[in-house]
A protein has these predicted regions:
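Short S/T/G/P-rich N-terminal loop/turn motif that feeds into the first structured element of a domain
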Residues: 1-200
Length: 200
């Protein structure tokens, strides 16, 4: 309540481990800069919030928990490489799809342009096949996974329902000649993946 124009905040909790990502979402880089200046700039609010925090929870609230703050990441969403079926209402879909599959992708050297064109071709092919799912593509600005050039985030109602939907999509794709052509010469590899649940 002390922060003006605060960004959207959400948590991502790893399903197969104990990592928690504290996330902030901004609509533009201008919003990021404005937020950081209001927080860390001269007369910024960070010191006031930190003081209130210490009054509420003490000097070392994480003592004994084993919490380890690793690093910060910043990604920008590539709307041109993201997939949303026509007519999708994200205000309705996001709360109903709390599962997130994060896949970090390494693109072969010198093949980034070709990779982007393949992703765009895949989007058009999924439209043709009437594949019904939501996928966001992100590109790291700083941080990110070692070797990861892009991060693909696919949504689902649950992990089980996500993989059920993936199986159906895969069957339609593998039976499609255009999809086979798009995938004929792989130019990227998966670095790692995580299954996460989101809390708004």
């Amino acid at each position: 309540s002390m922060v003006e124009n605060a960004p959207a905040i959400f948590l991502l909790s790893e399903m197969d481990g104990n990592t928690i990502y504290f996330c902030r979402a901004f609509n533009s880089m201008e919003e990021v800069i404005e937020y950081r200046q209001s927080r860390w700039g001269e007369n910024g609010w960070n010191s006031k919030v930190s003081e209130k925090w210490r009054e509420s929870v003490g000097e070392d609230p994480w003592k004994g928990t084993g919490a380890d703050v690793v690093m910060n990441h910043m990604f920008r969403m590539r709307t041109d490489l993201s997939y949303l079926p026509e007519g999708t209402n994200l205000d309705e879909e996001l709360p109903n799809n709390p599962y997130r599959r994060h896949v970090n992708i390494a693109v072969d050297w010198g093949k980034r342009g070709e990779f982007i064109e393949n992703i765009k071709a895949g989007i058009e092919n999924d439209k043709k096949l009437n594949n019904d799912y939501i996928r966001f593509m992100f590109q790291p600005i700083f941080g990110g996974i070692d070797g990861g050039d892009f991060m693909m985030v696919v949504l689902g109602e649950s992990r089980a329902s996500y993989f059920t939907g993936l199986e159906k999509r895969t069957a339609k794709r593998e039976a499609d000649g255009d999809w086979q052509k798009i995938q004929a010469n792989p130019i990227a590899t998966w670095v790692n993946e995580e299954s996460l649940m989101i809390t708004y």
